[in-house]
UniProtKB/Swiss-Prot annotation:
Disulfide bonds join 89-104. This is Protein Wnt-7b. A lipid is attached at residue 1 (O-palmitoleoyl serine). The keyword Acyltransferase does not apply. Belongs to the Wnt family. Its main location: secreted. One of its GO terms (biological process) is cell fate commitment.
Length: 123
């Protein structure tokens, strides 16, 4: 009875879009932390959640940050960011040059220009 059964197992990654959704959720729930340098008894340096009277450490699965990201929509001379105010945008684009994205949801003004010139046409 020379019967043989072969079983092959493998693991696969989730779809790229699923990973993107998970990362976006983690980004939206990111926790600001601060570095605590312990000096007593040679304890190691660690991170704790940055809140008043909080001594809680972040979970290993938390996405953490130390400094808040600058708001690139607003002008900030200290970082050299000119912001987006007054910039031209593409009203129909869904990309980074689109008005909805570039103006950070604050709305935008549209202008229509008419130019009249002499074309020197001969009939």
């Amino acid at each position: 009875s020379g019967s043989c059964t072969t079983k092959t197992c493998w693991t696969t990654l989730p779809k790229f879009r699923e990973i993107g959704y998970i990362l976006k959720e983690k980004y939206n729930a990111a926790v600001q932390v601060e570095v605590v340098r312990a000096s007593r008894l040679r304890q190691p340096t660690f991170l704790k959640i940055k809140q008043i009277r909080s001594y809680q450490k972040p979970m290993e699965t938390d996405l953490v940050y130390i400094d808040k990201s600058p708001n690139y929509c607003e002008e900030d001379a200290s970082t050299g960011s000119v912001g987006t105010q007054g910039r031209l945008c593409n009203r129909t684009s869904l990309s980074a040059d689109g008005c909805d994205m570039m103006c950070c949801g604050r709305g935008y003004n549209t202008h229509q220009y008419t130019k009249v010139w002499q074309c020197n046409c001969k009939f």
